[in-house]
């Protein structure tokens, strides 16, 4: 069957991290305020006023709070903003629960991040049965809301690209369609930066040549796009703008010699959004790899982190662990360390201005798990690993504290500059007053000398004589 004859859903959780944090708080205290109903956000620390916002509520959005901005800036916009720390363990729990529900409708599921997945429902919804597709989407939304307590958007189309775009339309708890004939009206008027797979740097390059909307990219000459973006990227943008995508929904498959997962990102990852968009994906992929290994009774020792750039070039780093493992925490720690070196290091991709469109995590040197009693030496090794992890966490904390102090020093420097400017203004004002007083004293002195001269004249000739003489002189001047 041709791809255009398929029925594809894209399911996306509304404000995932914020919703899941709210649900956890309500589980712990049913009388607690629902974070989704008040100005709130995930990330950072309200006491230290450092960190960034990784998720926000709809009420917080009304104050202009934005995902990815510093906490201190968000609190300036909304002083009553309630902040909670991220809890990836809770997020993984709700993510797994969501995927279990989706799996009841079809086995053809491709999870692309911790809070979104594609579903191929062609076998369940015959092509052309659009009313049936809408009804099933509502059923899925209701199922998730009633059983798990949060809401999702569902986008429907004939391919993954259009389904993903549709799910990003009005939120929350909505179903949207974007069939090929709807593309000109629904997708083409959108800003070019909203096109799936078009990152910030790509959008800026297109805007420089006058392409500001998706429709303008769709109507552009393909060779022009390729000359600006490169052969592969130019073709990708042109096809995407015209709603063309041949990417299939690809369920997870076990691999014999390694276990890996990779995800194409909804937008390019740069240094600016790595913490908010990149780290959660790496954590989710590590969890998925560990889950598959545990399910199959496997352990592994080499962790690989792989990325694909916006120009479709692949880069990877790998490291071997001291021991075989199937633990998500071990895989995640190694993957994050590799990502930090590959992306954020002095010679990292971000330093070179390269953005990332795909992330993959894998474990190799696989073997079947051996069940045995852990001896004293293994306990010592594990304790040493825990100590190393603690030290790494402490190092990260010190780095964050250093950044906070730098921010505070910058703030003090700014305040000192303001005070210096105020001092200079006051000095200038004092100089102006002194000049004014000098002028006034000079004027008074001149007046005093004039009065003294008048007094001398009057005392010598008499005041009446002077006035009469003046009158005579005036009459002479008038003749």
Regions found by a protein language model. Give the residues of each.
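Gly/Gly-Pro- and Ser/Thr-rich, intrinsically disordered tail segments characteristic of DNA damage-repair
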Residues: 1-236, 387-479
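DNA-contacting surface of Y-family translesion DNA polymerases
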Residues: 2-3, 10, 194, 202-356, ...
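Short, charged/polar surface micro-motifs in flexible loops or helix N-caps
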Residues: 14-16, 46-49, 310-313, 366-369
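Hydrophobic, well-ordered secondary-structure elements that form the walls
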Residues: 305, 361, 462
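Amphipathic alpha-helical surface "interface" segments used
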Residues: 307, 362-364, 475-479
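C-terminal hydrophobic structural anchor segments
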Residues: 324-408, 412-415, 419-422, 426-437, ...
């Amino acid at each position: 069957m041709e791809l255009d004859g398929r029925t594809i859903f894209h399911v996306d959780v509304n404000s995932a991290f914020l919703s899941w944090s709210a649900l956890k708080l309500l589980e712990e205290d049913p009388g607690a305020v629902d974070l989704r109903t008040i100005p709130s956000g995930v990330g950072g620390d309200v006491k230290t006023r450092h960190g960034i916002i990784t998720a926000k509520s709809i009420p917080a959005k009304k104050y202009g709070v934005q995902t990815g901005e510093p906490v201190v800036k968000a609190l300036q916009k909304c002083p009553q903003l309630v902040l909670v720390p991220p809890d990836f363990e809770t997020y993984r729990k709700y993510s797994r629960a969501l995927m279990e529900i989706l799996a009841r409708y079809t086995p053809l599921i491709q999870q692309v991040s911790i809070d979104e997945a594609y579903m191929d429902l062609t076998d369940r919804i015959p092509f052309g049965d659009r009313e049936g597709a809408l009804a099933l989407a509502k059923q899925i939304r209701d199922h998730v809301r009633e059983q798990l307590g949060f809401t999702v958007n569902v986008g429907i189309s004939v391919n993954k690209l259009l389904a993903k775009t549709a799910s990003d339309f009005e939120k929350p708890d909505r179903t949207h369609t974007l069939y090929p004939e709807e593309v000109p009206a629904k997708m083409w008027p959108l800003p070019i930066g909203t096109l799936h797979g078009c990152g910030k740097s790509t959008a800026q390059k297109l805007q420089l040549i006058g392409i500001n909307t998706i429709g303008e990219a769709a109507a552009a000459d393909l060779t022009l796009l390729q000359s600006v973006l490169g052969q592969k990227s130019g073709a990708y943008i042109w096809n995407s703008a015209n709603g063309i995508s041949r990417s299939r929904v690809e369920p997870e498959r076990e691999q014999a010699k390694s276990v890996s997962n990779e995800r194409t990102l909804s937008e390019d990852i740069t240094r600016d959004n790595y913490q908010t968009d990149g780290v959660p994906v790496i954590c989710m992929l590590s969890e998925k790899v560990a889950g598959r290994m545990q399910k199959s009774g496997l352990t592994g020792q080499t962790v690989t982190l792989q990325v694909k750039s916006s120009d479709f070039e692949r880069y990877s780093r790998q490291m071997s662990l001291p021991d075989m493992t199937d633990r998500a925490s071990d895989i995640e720690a190694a993957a994050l360390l590799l990502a930090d070196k590959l992306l954020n290091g002095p010679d990292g991709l971000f330093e070179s201005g390269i953005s990332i469109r795909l992330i993959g995590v894998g474990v190799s040197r696989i073997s079947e798990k051996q069940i045995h009693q852990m001896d004293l030496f293994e306990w010592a090794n594990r304790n040493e690993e825990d100590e190393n992890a603690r030290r790494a966490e402490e190092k990260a904390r010190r780095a964050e504290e250093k950044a906070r102090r730098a921010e505070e020093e910058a703030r003090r420097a700014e305040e000192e500059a303001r005070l210096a400017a105020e001092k200079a203004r006051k000095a200038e004002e004092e100089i102006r007053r002194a000049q004014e007083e000098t002028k006034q004293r000079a004027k008074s002195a001149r007046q005093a000398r004039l009065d003294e001269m008048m007094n001398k004249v009057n005392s010598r000739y008499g005041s009446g004589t002077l006035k009469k003489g003046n009158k005579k002189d005036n009459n002479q001047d008038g003749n």
